[in-house]
Amino acid sequence: MAIPANFLRACHVCPLKKPAGCCKEQTMNIVDQQTFRDAMSCMGAAVNIITTDGPAGRAGFTASAVCSVTDTPPTLLVCLNRGASVWPVFNENRTLCVNTLSAGQEPLSNLFGGKTPMELRFAAARWQTGVTGCPQLEEALVSFDCRISQVVSVGTHDILFCAIEAIHRHATPYGLVWFDRSYHALMRPAC
């Protein structure tokens, strides 16, 4: 979890039997944005297309900021920039589907990661409707159909905590990860 700038004072605990105030408060160094982004490029992550459909309409975007939170109840999180054009749609619909891509689906990832109109994004693949009403990619490695249970804002992003209502796995796909600012196929079956 990212720590807001106004909380960046290091906590201090004095050793037992030392007088109060024996330790000095220290301020943590803040890493600049480019250094942070360069370091994050070293963390490989699954490539996902996040979709929604509901009262606010249909939308989707590419994301790698997705991870498991807990298995009791099954919950994952998705990070979404509040400045993104799709943010109002996800914010109103309160449902989403995390579609984890397989190797070979890089063009679809690029399409959903750009400025392509929504109808053209969705026309580029085959979709089913999940239990929440969200589009579920037929050829996804795995799809997690979810309801947004909680939203926490940190910096420029909202962290969407998503209660999983259904999971669909593809039979024998190969995985796709984003690492060092490029796509990489996993060389053996992922499921």
UniProtKB/Swiss-Prot annotation:
Domain of life: Bacteria
Keyword Transport among UniProt keywords: no
InterPro entries linked to this entry: Flavin_Rdtase-like_dom, NADH-dep_flavin_reductase, RutF, Split_barrel_FMN-bd
Induction entry: Up-regulated by the nitrogen regulatory protein C (NtrC also called GlnG) and repressed by RutR.
EC number: 1.5.1.42
Keywords: Flavoprotein, FMN, NAD, Oxidoreductase
GO molecular function: FMN binding; FMN reductase (NADH) activity; FMN reductase [NAD(P)H] activity; riboflavin reductase (NADPH) activity
Catalytic activity reported: FMNH2 + NAD(+) = FMN + NADH + 2 H(+)
Example GO BP: uracil catabolic process
PANTHER family: FLAVIN REDUCTASE, FMN REDUCTASE (NADH) RUTF
NCBIfam families: RutF
Protein function: Catalyzes the reduction of FMN to FMNH2 which is used to reduce pyrimidine by RutA via the Rut pathway.
Family: Belongs to the non-flavoprotein flavin reductase family. RutF subfamily.
Name this polypeptide is given: FMN reductase (NADH) RutF
Source species of the chain: Escherichia coli O1:K1 / APEC
Organism lineage: Bacteria, Pseudomonadati, Pseudomonadota, Gammaproteobacteria, Enterobacterales
